[in-house]
Amino acid sequence: AKGLAGGVPIGACLADEKCCDVLTKGTHGSTFGGNPIACAGGLTVLNKVTSDGFLDKASQKANYFREKLSEIPEVEGIDGIGLMIGVRLKTKTAADVCKSCLDNGLMILTAKEKLRFLPPLNITYDEIDEGIEILKNVLK
């Protein structure tokens, strides 16, 4: 939910028509639901994400990122959707690589034995290249 309002706490509940018939007015709510600051943040993000070409650009960046990752000899495989990317390594452990990346200015996560990349949708190509260079140096 963090990305829903650009880092401002907000949540959303999506339901199909059958469930919506059960959730009638006043049957679902929260103490701080509808906070105007959170809603303004959510609306701003929604407007940005639905603007012309935004998601196409994010998809192009994801493809570019995956292509650059696949060029690294130590990379065994790449999984994920869009810019949510998991990388399997041939020999090094994800935990060790993750720590070394952080020590060199690249913040990534792990999921079991995969490196997890979760950049923002508005990441730049230069930022992708910088991250790739750090990863390459760590994997040498």
Tell what function each PLM region has.
Residues A1-K140:
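Conserved N-terminal phosphate-binding loop of PLP-dependent enzymes in the Aspartate aminotransferase
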